[in-house]
Swiss-Prot record:
The chain crosses the membrane at residues 88-108, 139-159, 167-187, 201-221, 224-244, 250-270, 362-382, 389-409. This is Presenilin-2. Keywords: Endoplasmic reticulum, Golgi apparatus, Hydrolase, Membrane, Notch signaling pathway, Phosphoprotein, Protease, Transmembrane, Transmembrane helix. Residues 1-70 are annotated as: Disordered. Its main location: endoplasmic reticulum. Residues 19-30 have a biased composition (Polar residues).
Length: 448
């Protein structure tokens, strides 16, 4: 699931701060009228609105009063997209790093390519000579795996709906403990064994303890954003390596296709579990748990719903009649005034931080399944580098298209369908067409 966090409106109301101009330039007529009484201000705003509608012209002073001097709405939208491009690039880096960690481990550590067991969620074996039986077993494994994922997602949404925050935090903490301590211990032991590096157990345990303790603090409490992002990338890579090792080959490809379809349904359907989770978080003005989401930037809590200021002690921007005609977004839904946290110190007239730090949020599940696809391409079959690089490029192309759609629709979108579809197409076409062609050229010593 991919979400773009940006305020619905960057315009400010006409007050002492936003209408400050140099003493040499005269104050615009609309700003002077804006300082009149409430009734006069409403009548003036209505008269100006009707006049603009009849003449079909825009008053440039209006943008000065709204905190956007001489900037038309089209330019504002253009600047918004340019500003978000930085965070789009910032999202490519962690996805690339996660896939690089997985591919490097698959190519060097033999432990994750040895098939000596299966997950409990995939009980049907694929060690059968019959193609039909193997395909049937892979479909049955996929049905069981997707059913478990759906059940766990619905269970999480129900817990969040009924505010069982302590249970959810305990659940996430136990998962993080297992990944940061147990899986890290196994991973580090296999890496040291592969590269023939000797290390005594006290040093190994101390290293794992320091790594896991710092990760728990950064993810579930406080820590530098870069360090938190690094731990989330490492957690995703460790989970992807577990799936690569214990998922049967055919079942893995069928599961990747099925999980992309489920992601599409869960995010876009009105009663989809992931969509309900995001909408509930927006209604309550609460951030989604950081252990489930990767954020490309630090995002401060800004109200996204119409809340009662007296109930939470928040400061709401005053109502401006001039913004009545702009109070609906492109989809016909009302854009409510944003609610900001009051300052810790100072007076009511002190400046507030009204600019929200924008960022793109990507679920850790997307990191995991991207890495599973690339890791399986590197581990199964021929393990050709052309196939691995083709899957890598396909995932980035799909992610880029998803981010483009995100900038257009400005709502939560599934991040798996396009990338996984491109990845599967590139994998099978490269493995069955490009690789044999390259092998034939190499055998005849022909170079293009």
């Amino acid at each position: 699931m991919l979400t773009f966090m940006a305020s619905d409106s960057e315009e400010e109301v006409c007050d002492e701060r936003t209408s400050l101009m140099s003493a040499e330039s005269p104050t615009p007529r609309s700003c002077q009228e804006g300082r009149q009484g409430p009734e006069d201000g409403e009548n003036t705003a209505q008269w100006r609105s009707q006049e603009n509608e009849e003449d079909g012209e825009e008053d440039p002073d209006r943008y000065i009063c709204s905190g956007v001097p001489g900037r038309p709405p089209g330019l504002e939208e253009e600047l918004t997209l340019k500003y978000g491009a930085k965070h789009v690039i910032m999202l490519f880096v962690p996805v690339t790093l996660c896939m690089i960690v997985v591919v490097a481990t698959i190519k060097s550590v033999r432990f994750y390519t040895e098939k000596n067991g299966q997950l409990i969620y995939t009980p049907f074996t694929e060690d059968t000579p019959s193609v039909g039986q193997r395909l049937l077993n892979s479909v049955l494994n996929t049905l069981i795996m997707i059913s478990v994922i759906v059940a766990m997602t619905i269970f999480l949404v129900v817990l969040y709906k009924y505010r069982c925050y302590k249970f959810i935090h305990g659940w996430l903490i136990m998962s993080s403990l297992m990944l940061l301590f147990l899986f890290t211990y196994i991973y580090l032991g296999e890496v040291l064994k592969t590269y023939n590096v000797a290390m005594d157990y006290p040093t190994l345990l101390l290293t794992v303890w320091n790594f896991g303790a710092v990760g728990m603090v950064c993810i579930h409490w406080k820590g530098p954003l870069v360090l938190q992002q690094a731990y989330l990338i490492m957690i995703s890579a460790l989970m992807a390596l577990v799936f690569i090792k214990y998922l049967p080959e055919w079942s893995a490809w069928v599961i990747l296709g099925a999980i992309s379809v489920y992601d599409l349904v869960a995010v876009l359907c009105p009663k989809g579990p992931l969509r309900m989770l995001v909408e509930t978080a927006q209604e309550r003005n609460e951030p989604i748990f950081p252990a489930l989401i990767y954020s490309s930037a630090m995002v401060w809590t800004v109200g996204m719903a119409k809340l009662d200021p007296s109930s939470q002690g928040a400061l709401q921007l005053p109502y401006d009649p001039e913004m009545e005609e702009d109070s609906y977004d492109s989809f016909g839904e009302p854009s409510y005034p944003e609610v900001f946290e009051p300052p810790l110190t100072g007076y009511p007239g002190e400046e507030l931080e009204e600019e929200e730090e924008r960022g793109v949020k990507l679920g850790l599940g997307d990191f995991i399944f991207y890495s599973v696809l690339v890791g399986k391409a590197a581990a199964t079959g021929s393990g050709d580098w052309n196939t691995t690089l083709a899957c890598f490029v396909a995932i980035l192309i799909g992610l880029c298209l998803t981010l483009l759609l995100l900038a257009v629709f400005k709502k939560a979108l599934p991040a798996l369908p396009i990338s996984i579809t491109f990845g599967l197409i590139f994998y099978f076409s490269t493995d069955n067409l490009v690789r044999p062609f390259m092998d034939t050229l190499a055998s005849h010593q022909l170079y293009i």
